[in-house]
């Protein structure tokens, strides 16, 4: 099964690119983040015309997440369970595969900046609380004894090799020690971080480049989009 995640930064602006990519790549399940639209404004018909089932958790102007799947999406959950949140950052559903049920997600984890000098700014506290709630929910999912994938834009740079310049990110919410520790606690529940486990880290796995800073031509990227997997069966590659 081919899982994919994409922070589209406005589905309205990126729709032609999304449609072209879906036709070319043919992913089985896709998580989209930063839709920046309410559910009623999501271009459902255009995506369904390509053979995808669609579930959204939208929000006007900001945030918003969606799941697209070639298989029916069942048992849909909107919002991170156990966490009161006015922002639309989490959606979850179950797809039935020939190997059993797979619970899939689309996550748009808070950025967390500014952090404050002491790491106590409300935006950073919100990020850490959100990650703690995700850890708790992952523990719950593990109790179901079914495969699942936590996928999306985590706004976490896991390690020095996941950014073009570690020193440039020191003190940033994406790279603070507290962020690393929270991310590691989630993985240490027994999950597999797909890219890291494939031994293909480095600048060929960056997922974000700041267009305002001209980062793309210089390959000044970072890896902040992740798939954390709980698999009940093995595949030749965690990327498959």
List the model feature ranges, each with a label.
Residues 1-10, 101-116, 120:
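Active-site-proximal beta-strand elements of phosphoester/diester hydrolases
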Residues 6-7, 22-40, 104, 137-160, ...:
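Active-site beta-strand/loop signature of hydrolases that rely on acidic residues for catalysis
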Residues 35-38, 42-114:
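Structured beta-strand-rich core segments of catalytic domains in phosphoester-bond hydrolases
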Residues 50-51, 130-224:
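Metal-dependent phosphoesterases centered on the DNase I-like endonuclease/exonuclease/phosphatase
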Residues 61-76, 203, 214-232:
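Conserved beta strand-loop-helix elements of the APE1-like EEP
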Residues 81, 111-131, 169-171:
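Surface-exposed cleft-lining segments at the edges of enzyme active sites
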